[in-house]
């Protein structure tokens, strides 16, 4: 006699396919240990499934489950006719797995948010040649206009060879300025705080001396030696205070100047036209003799890649930053769970599960919302 149970229960299994796939579905929403997953299933379905059974089902079926879900997603994407836009975000992140360092390379569409490719490789394989291979292989057969990246030295040559435009992330450009600038600013702030404390202490001593001998005008008689010493001490303290005030003004002026130049550089990237941006940039660079060394060195270095920094001004479809892929990393493999996984397979499975959720929410759902709003 033929039954339909095979659709729901695999041969020689005690639990339905739904129960076996429970951990996969749960893992797309939140992380839970095998013990906690077993407890959730038992509480929800009134069963007595063991931690070991949950583990075995995942090892046996995870890759097949993920492959089926990914195939379904791509089928849906093809049906909705969601195509690659030609604008892509590329980045890498380092992941430590069981004390070994791996590199995750990712390429996502800047407009449709489709994950073009996302892989993990051992750190010793990661080099300029591999980046080129990854991008070339990932973009094969796809429309290619622009690639948005951070400031890695290898990127410009590779992207030029691919025949694409290159946009440097504005956020990362400012980071290269801010790292040395923050040290300088904090150093100046510490000096200013130190001088202000010294000035306050000097003033306290002056006030105390004034309270001891409150002469209104002129010097006290020479016969009053204590009063004369009091006046001399106050005079010395006032001179020291004046010297400190001069230093304070100098450091405050330097700090104010650095912050103003930093804001002017940041403002360059807010303008929409190439002409305005480049004029503002050149005006700053022309002030070589007036600029603090740290600001001039940054501008001089930026001038070598200014075309890549301002590519967005020539095409409004180019994003200014690589923030989307930074968000992608935080969503698909957040820091709070990075140290939990001890095998490459476990990390890859978790990332694939979260990538499926990303595609469902950020690609398919957003496309359907956009279509319904038209």
Predicted segments with their positions:
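RNase H-like nuclease fold core
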Residues: 10-18, 25, 29, 34, ...
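Acidic/histidine-rich catalytic cores and adjacent linkers
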Residues: 149-156, 161, 197-374
